């Protein structure tokens, strides 16, 4: 079986600064399958995507005065905010938010975790299959959202924050 995956980043990226990954058409919709999730009233385009994004995050324990970014929820990873992974260092809180509707930019918290393991590699997998978004943390399914339709065009991936 041929591996159809694409490596977007092959080295460590620090999250104390914003890094934008230019992906330029690396994820494409399947033109042969018209699809719009059921119950979706505001989606004008039809989308059918099947993809997975795997990433490893290592968060060091730092004192609260390390950076202003530690005092607020700071993006660790964002794929056009569909989803966006945020971390608040002062309270060791982690959350995943996303825009559930293409026509409404309101963000919804779909997962929250207190006490994310520090000084340990945490493995995240974002799996999208024709309207269902599954997110795994360290091999455990933590989110499964149905009827989600991300708009994927030439979107960039953001890692870290200023």
Residue ranges and their predicted role:
Residues 1-162:
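Extracellular glycan-associated modules
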């Amino acid at each position: 079986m041929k591996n159809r995956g694409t490596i977007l980043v092959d080295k460590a990226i620090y999250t104390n600064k914003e890094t934008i990954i230019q992906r330029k058409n690396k994820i494409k919709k399947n033109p042969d399958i018209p699809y719009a999730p059921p119950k979706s009233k505001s989606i004008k385009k039809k989308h059918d995507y099947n993809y997975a994004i795997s990433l490893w995050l290592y968060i060091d324990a730092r004192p609260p005065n390390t950076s202003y970014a530690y005092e607020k929820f700071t993006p660790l990873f964002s794929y056009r905010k569909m989803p966006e992974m945020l971390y608040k260092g002062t309270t060791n809180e982690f959350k995943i938010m996303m825009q559930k509707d293409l026509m409404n930019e309101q963000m919804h918290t779909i997962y929250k975790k207190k006490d994310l393991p520090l000084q340990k590699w945490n493995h995240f997998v974002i799996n999208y299959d024709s309207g269902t978004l599954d997110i795994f943390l360290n091999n455990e399914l933590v989110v499964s959202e149905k009827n989600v339709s991300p708009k994927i065009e030439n979107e960039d991936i953001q890692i870290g924050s200023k």
